[in-house]
UniProtKB/Swiss-Prot annotation:
The keyword Membrane applies. The chain crosses the membrane at residues 425-447. It is a single-pass membrane protein. PANTHER family: DUF4484 DOMAIN-CONTAINING PROTEIN, PROTEIN, PUTATIVE-RELATED. This is Uncharacterized protein C119.16c. GO terms for cellular component: cytoplasm; endoplasmic reticulum; endoplasmic reticulum membrane; Golgi apparatus; Golgi membrane; lipid droplet. Residues 328-428 form the dDENN domain. Residues 4-155 form the uDENN domain. It comes from Schizosaccharomyces pombe (strain 972 / ATCC 24843) (Fission yeast). Residues 183-326 form the cDENN domain. It holds the Pfam family DENND11. It is found in: Golgi apparatus membrane; Endoplasmic reticulum membrane.
């Protein structure tokens, strides 16, 4: 059984949140009406919401309906399917999305007719007919008929009897979709997010509502997963990062009280959660609706202190974008950052991307890197040196990268790292910084 329950909830300025109907009748839906509606509903016309209710996933469609007869001329409906199968957002949309749209359309129409009369429902129906192409499928027609008649038991039976598509885990199209999201919305912040996910930390994404936030969660969970290896020296002790998807102030206690060893990732529109530093280890924040403007997020640690991507993160992102983008972007930026990092920070061109990436699925590529990371750590934990860091595309002098390696070794392999950098390694770094600064001042003096 794929679907546990179907729920219809409404909101208006006079009556507040209400669960209008649900099926089966013995299913406990207490409190779900607050989760079915996103924060800032007055600013949204419609959207898809994905969240956990009683540790089960729920996919819902929210709609804002406007008519002079409504309280403050606005009435809100949300129809949710509580799922029993443990799938991610992308799979849920493909599997149930179109079906849920038809059900939500019919139930909203029937609710308007019941509460506000024929005129309001006809206005809503005409708007939907012009904005959506209705399917001629007998299945969808029967769904809408049951929805319009508020036959929840019939809807539930039809949903249970339908054979939904079985989806592949790693498709090329999915990889391309993730690549677009990474380039447009994450930028160099991606590598910081990816590293914290590998460390199984608590991660919070804060932005105005956008379905692609759920896709970012799906992507990070998959990219940070580690497949079980045949190598007995690499035990897999942790599960994938736990996705909570959409959360709000009502979920604060759940997030604080959980003891998930595998960490979690969630998104919210409640910016006040950014001030609750004990709630998360890493927060990505898109201020002032900038998520839709293709701007990169600000990054905050658990002390609510803003951090910025390292030079190596910039190098790796430039390399990644070089392979993922199709606009023929110049590699000058990559060269500039590589030279700066090589001669000032003692790294080399061992980036997290290489020529092999061109012929690989992005999801497979990062899972292969994760396996390589554990293999190198398992072999060299007792004597980890500069060359080992460079092999992994990490900065041997950057404190966040060193902390990353130490934590990965501890939580995945239960080993402590024994750093072997050489007695005078720090002198090399200082001398190179001095040399680079001198060259910069000399060039500046010549230019002036």
């Amino acid at each position: 059984m794929s679907i546990q329950a179907i729920v219809l909830a409404t909101f208006d300025a006079k009556e507040g949140y209400n669960v209008e109907n649900y099926y089966p009748g013995d299913f406990n839906v207490e409190g779900i009406e607050y989760l079915l509606f996103p924060s800032g509903i007055q600013e949204l016309d419609n959207c898809t919401i994905f969240f956990r209710f009683q540790d089960q996933l729920c996919l819902s469609v929210f709609s804002k309906l406007q008519h002079p007869s409504f309280e403050r001329s606005a009435f809100f409906t949300s129809v949710g399917l509580i799922l029993s199968d443990d799938i991610n957002f992308g799979e849920a949309v493909v599997k149930y999305g179109e079906t849920l749209l038809y059900i939500a359309n019919g139930l909203s129409l029937a609710t308007l007719k019941y509460k506000f009369g024929e005129d309001a429902s006809e206005t809503y129906a005409s708007e939907k007919c012009t904005s959506h192409q209705l399917s001629d499928s007998d299945f969808f027609k029967s769904l809408q008929t049951s929805a319009v008649n508020l036959e929840f038991d019939s809807l539930f039976e039809k949903l249970q009897g339908n054979k939904f598509a079985i989806l592949g885990a790693n498709s090329k199209e999915l990889s391309q979709s993730y690549a677009t999201i990474l380039l447009d919305h994450l930028g160099p912040a991606f590598y910081c997010l990816y590293k914290f996910a590998l460390q199984r930390k608590r991660i919070l994404l804060i932005s105005s509502h956008d379905d692609q936030l759920y896709s970012i969660i799906d992507m990070i969970v998959r990219l940070s997963s580690i497949k079980r290896s045949s190598d007995a020296s690499i035990p897999i002790l942790l599960s994938d990062l736990h996705p909570f998807y959409s959360v709000g102030l009502a979920n604060t206690s759940t997030l604080l009280d959980n003891d998930l060893e595998e960490g979690w990732i969630a998104c919210t529109t409640d910016t006040v959660l950014l001030s609750k530093s004990s709630l998360y280890d890493l927060a990505l924040y898109w201020p002032d609706n900038s998520f839709n403007a293709n701007k990169y997020p600000q990054i905050f640690n658990s002390n609510s202190i803003r951090i910025k991507p390292s030079y190596d993160d910039l190098i790796n992102f430039k390399g990644l974008s070089r392979y993922l983008s199709f606009d023929g972007e110049s590699s000058w930026g990559l060269t500039t950052y590589s030279l700066a990092s090589k001669y000032i920070f003692n790294t080399s061109h061992h980036n997290l991307t290489d020529q092999e990436f061109l012929n690989e699925n992005m999801l497979d590529y990062f899972q292969r890197y994760n396996q390589k990371l554990l293999t190198v750590l398992s072999s060299n934990a007792e004597s980890f040196n500069v060359s080992d860091m460079q092999t992994l595309g990490l900065n041997p002098c950057h404190s966040l990268d060193k902390s990353f390696v130490s934590e990965i070794s501890q939580i995945w392999l239960k080993k402590h790292i024994n750093w072997q950098y050489g007695k005078y390694f720090w002198l090399r770094r200082v001398s190179l910084i001095f040399l680079a600064s001198t060259c910069f001042l000399f060039i500046l003096w010549k230019l002036l």
